Design a protein with these regions (language model features):
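Generic alpha-helix detector with strongest preference for long hydrophobic helices that associate
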Residues: 1, 44, 58, 109-112
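Short acidic-aromatic active-site loops that bind/stabilize oxyanions
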Residues: 1, 49-56, 114-125
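Single conserved hydrophobic/aromatic residue that forms the stacking wall/gate
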Residues: 1-12
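Broad gene-expression machinery/nucleic-acid interaction feature
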Residues: 7, 74, 165
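Charged, low-complexity, helix-prone segments enriched in Lys/Glu/Asp/Gln
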Residues: 8, 20-28, 32, 114-124
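Extended, H/D-rich, highly charged conserved domains that either
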Residues: 13-89, 100
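Feature marks hydrolase-like catalytic cores characterized by long aromatic- and Gly/Pro-rich stretches
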Residues: 68-71, 79-215
């Protein structure tokens, strides 16, 4: 039994060493891969929050180029942060007269307050639409880059800081078995957000039975 246990431990050790060797080989291969040549014409790398449209558009263009050159296959971008004095003031830079935090809280009053928040939401949505259109217009295989890319656009908590009824948008992924182009209203059912993440894991060939509190 002792001999069997030692053999098992040696097998585990050898497997772990081989995994480390493979990872080192992968990293060395990536490190020596020539960097792609990409046009920088549409990249305003000196953009700042003082010109939010140019800054956000540049960030989306960087993500697009990273995908196009296969420099990465995963990207996250936090478009807004109310905890950042710079980004919370973006609506003021756009002439909307208040910080994003105040716009969100005052929207419940309706009238001009709701209209201002709507304009800011549209500002962000228009830039997202440009990014999605660029993916859709880029041929890839037998379809477009959007067909094999998942774009998940989220939101913040509600006016009362409640983290339910999040509006979310999922675009692309038709080649991955997803079915975009639908409006789904869950009403009072309130399924956990992790259900979406579980669906995406499986669509992206990461077989999973559970993710967080998914049901």
């Amino acid at each position: 039994h002792l001999r069997t246990r030692r053999q098992r431990q040696m097998c585990i050790r050898d497997r772990a060493l081989r995994d480390v060797e493979k990872e080192i080989e992968r990293m060395e291969s990536w490190a020596t891969t020539p960097k792609p040549n990409v046009p920088a014409d549409n990249l305003a790398l000196d953009a700042s929050v003082k010109d939010p449209a140019t800054f956000i558009r540049t960030m989306y263009n960087l993500i697009y180029l990273a995908f196009k050159t296969d420099s990465t296959r995963y990207a996250t971008y936090m478009l807004q942060s109310m905890n950042s004095s710079k980004w919370d003031n973006v609506p003021i830079a756009l002439g909307l007269g208040a910080t994003h935090h105040l716009l969100a809280h005052n929207a419940v009053k309706g009238g001009v307050h709701l209209e201002r928040l709507g304009k800011y939401d549209k500002f962000q949505a228009d830039l997202l639409a440009e990014f999605i259109a660029k993916l859709a217009d880029t041929p890839e295989g037998e379809g477009s880059m959007l067909d094999s890319t998942v774009v998940l656009y989220g939101s913040s908590n509600s006016q009362t800081h409640v983290n339910t009824d999040y509006p979310l948008m999922l675009a692309g992924g038709e080649k991955l078995g997803l079915k975009p182009g639908r409006l789904i209203d869950f009403g009072q059912v309130a399924p956990p957000l992790s259900n979406i993440y579980l669906t995406l894991l499986n669509a992206l060939d990461v077989p999973s039975q559970q993710f967080s509190d998914s049901n």
